[in-house]
C-alpha cells in the first residue's frame, strides 16, 4: 500500500506541475482584467503587420506567442455576441459560457514563423486574412476594474470557424 500511495502522490505532483505550466502559458498580465487582456490580444491590432502587432502581446508575456487571431471588429460588437445563446465551449467541454457570432467578421490570424527565445523583438509572424465566425467565452465583468457599461464581457477567444 505504501509504494502505491507514494507513487500516486508523485503522479499527482507531476500532474499539478504540468497544469501549472499549461496555466502559465494562458495567464494574463496582472495589471489587466480578463476583458482588458482579451481586447489587447484580439481586438487592438496595433499594426497592419502581424510581426509588429504581436510585439505588444509578446512584450507583456515575455515570450513569442505561437499564434493569435485579431478580430477586425470593435470590443462593443464582441460584447454584443455575449448576448447570443450560451453554448458549450469547443475547447473546454466543461465550460458553458461560450457564444457564437451571428455573422462572419474579417480577421487576421498570426502564426509564428521565426521564433526568437533570446530576443522576443525578433519573433516573426506570417499572417492570414479571412472572414469567419468566432466563438467567445464571456463572464461577468470585474466589478472593481472593468467599466460598468458592459455587465458581461468577452474573456477568451475560444475558436474561429
From Swiss-Prot:
Could you confirm whether the keyword Signal appears in this record?
A: yes
Tell me the Gene Ontology biological-process terms attached to this UniProt entry.
chemotaxis; defense response to virus; innate immune response in mucosa
* Record's signal peptide: 1-27
State where substrate binds: 65-69
- List S-S links within the chain: 50-110, 64-123, 82-138, 89-98
Reaction catalysis annotation? an [RNA] containing cytidine + H2O = an [RNA]-3'-cytidine-3'-phosphate + a 5'-hydroxy-ribonucleotide-3'-[RNA]; an [RNA] containing uridine + H2O = an [RNA]-3'-uridine-3'-phosphate + a 5'-hydroxy-ribonucleotide-3'-[RNA]
Q: Which GO terms describe its molecular function?
A: lyase activity; nucleic acid binding; ribonuclease A activity
So where's the catalytic machinery, residue-wise? 42, 156
Q: Which residues are glycosylated?
A: 34, 44, 86, 92, 111, 119
What domain of life does the native source organism fall in? Eukaryota
| Localization annotation | Lysosome; Cytoplasmic granule
Enzyme class, broadest EC rank: lyase
Free-text function comment from the UniProt entry: This is a non-secretory ribonuclease. It is a pyrimidine specific nuclease with a slight preference for U. Cytotoxin and helminthotoxin. Possesses a wide variety of biological activities.
**Similarity section:** Belongs to the pancreatic ribonuclease family.
Describe its partners and assembly state: Interacts with and forms a tight 1:1 complex with RNH1. Dimerization of two such complexes may occur.
What PANTHER family does the record tag this protein with?
A: NON-SECRETORY RIBONUCLEASE, RIBONUCLEASE
Q: What is this protein called?
A: Non-secretory ribonuclease
The organism is Nomascus leucogenys (Northern white-cheeked gibbon)
Instruction: Identify the taxonomic lineage of the organism of origin.
Output: Eukaryota, Metazoa, Chordata, Craniata, Vertebrata
Amino acid at each position: 500500500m505504501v509504494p502505491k500511495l507514494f507513487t500516486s502522490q508523485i503522479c499527482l505532483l507531476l500532474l499539478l506541475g504540468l497544469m501549472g505550466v499549461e496555466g502559465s502559458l494562458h495567464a494574463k498580465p496582472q495589471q489587466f482584467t480578463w476583458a482588458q487582456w482579451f481586447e489587447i490580444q484580439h481586438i487592438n491590432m496595433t499594426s497592419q503587420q502581424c510581426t509588429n502587432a504581436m510585439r505588444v502581446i509578446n512584450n507583456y508575456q515575455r515570450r513569442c506567442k505561437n499564434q493569435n487571431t485579431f478580430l477586425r471588429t470593435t470590443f462593443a460588437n464582441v460584447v454584443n455576441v455575449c448576448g447570443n445563446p450560451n453554448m458549450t465551449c469547443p475547447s473546454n467541454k466543461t465550460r458553458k459560457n461560450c457564444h457564437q457570432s451571428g455573422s462572419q467578421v474579417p480577421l487576421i490570424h498570426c502564426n509564428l514563423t521565426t521564433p526568437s527565445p533570446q530576443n522576443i523583438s525578433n519573433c516573426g509572424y506570417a499572417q492570414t486574412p479571412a472572414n469567419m465566425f468566432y466563438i467567445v467565452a464571456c463572464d461577468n465583468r470585474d466589478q472593481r476594474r472593468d467599466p460598468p457599461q458592459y455587465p458581461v464581457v468577452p474573456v477568451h477567444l475560444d475558436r474561429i470557424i
